[in-house]
């Protein structure tokens, strides 16, 4: 069985507070995009899982401790599965990029093993093991109003150029430097019921982690300005804790033209075109 495991983009990211358990309460508009890892999953007779990574970003994956290993341990501990599996993952999504590749891999496998029937209780438990962004991969577009709740809205067709400088961002390190917090926001459906209205709303948002990463890596700020200045770019932003930066466009042709120009300016960086799924 071959699965497509999609990347996610944080269209906005507000850090509201730090909880007693050390996690941060956040809010985020987000979407899944068609940049994906390909997962080949099959049941095996052996009494040990076989997990392989290949592709352009496979060397950066921790082979001894990762989301797939953690997921299988978790499901067996709860006696949800008893079988063992061979898993081959072609890593097309950058690692240490803020695109949620590892968490998305676990979510894709979880959906298949549980046939899409995942209770809130199980999802909450799984998130504590896999990652707090796990639930995002069960929704193609939405608004995360807090760590446990997603508000759904009508999907918008959006186009992106993605750029990753040669930087690895540690999520733990970036969050540890958060000192300022943003007010919670309320979602008003009538303000985002069209594509243009939605883009207008999110263009006025921010990623609260972006300034922290820009301070540590000045190239991020330079890159975001270069993306923003391309013709047709609605806004540029960093996703998650970085280091992938993106520009949002209303149409595919304009986005691809901008992508080709930026490739000349930053020849050593990773680039990709993407659209919402």
Name these PLM-found stretches:
Residues 77-86, 112-130, 251-262:
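Phosphate-handling active-site elements
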Residues 51-53, 137-235, 248-268, 272-277:
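Conserved, helical-rich catalytic subdomain that frames metal- and/or nucleotide-binding sites
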Residues 25-29, 71, 126-128, 136-137, ...:
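A general structural detector for well-ordered alpha-helical segments in enzyme core domains, enriched
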Residues 97-126, 136:
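DPxDG-like acidic metal-binding loop motif
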Residues 242-245:
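Conserved glycine-rich beta-strand-loop-beta hairpin in the small C-terminal domain of fold type I
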Residues 1-97, 115-121, 160, 164-167:
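ATP-binding N-lobe of GHMP and related small-molecule kinases
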